[in-house]
C-alpha cells in the first residue's frame, strides 16, 4: 500500500510540475503594451523617439505615444500622437526558459519580437517587448 501511495504521489507531483511548465513566462497576448523608445537611423545619425516619461533619459527625442495590442495572431500598433494605426500578424518562432520569441509582420514588413521579464538593478521586474522591424528598434513595456 505504501508503494502504491508513493507512486500516486509521485505521479501527481509530476503532472503538477509539467502543467506548471510555461506558467509565469509572459506572452505577447498577456498585456496591453506601451512604447518606451524607438530607435532608427536617419542618414548617419541614430534618432530616438520616446514616451513622455522617457524625455529625461532622451532629451533629444521626439515625444510620441504608441500602444500595441496582440490577440489571436493579429497585432495592432496605434500611434496616438498622429492617429495612425498599423496592423499585422504574429506567430511563435520559439520559446525559451524566460519568454517567447515571435515572427511579426506589420503593414507588409517582417521582423522579430520577444517577450520576457526584464530585471532591473534594483531587483524589480517588468514584462518587456522589444521589436526589430524594418530598420526600427522598438521597446514596449506592459501597461
Regions from the PLM with identified roles:
Residues 81-83, 107-112, 133-137:
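Glycine-centered tight beta-turn/hairpin loop motif at sheet-sheet or coil-to-beta transitions
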Residues 2-23:
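Sec-dependent N-terminal signal peptides of Gram-positive bacterial secreted proteins and lipoproteins
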Residues 21-43:
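N-terminal helix-cap/turn-to-beta initiation motif at the start of protein domains
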Residues 37-40, 77-81, 131-134:
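Beta-turn initiation residues at beta-strand->coil junctions
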Residues 26-34, 52-54, 71-76, 97-103, ...:
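Short, hydrophobic/aromatic-rich segments at coil-to-beta transitions
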Residues 51-58, 94-120:
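An anionic, turn-rich surface loop/hairpin at beta-sheet edges
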Residues 85-96, 130-143:
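Edge beta-strand at a domain terminus
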Residues 45-97:
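N-terminal glycine/threonine-rich, aromatic-flanked beta-hairpin/loop signature
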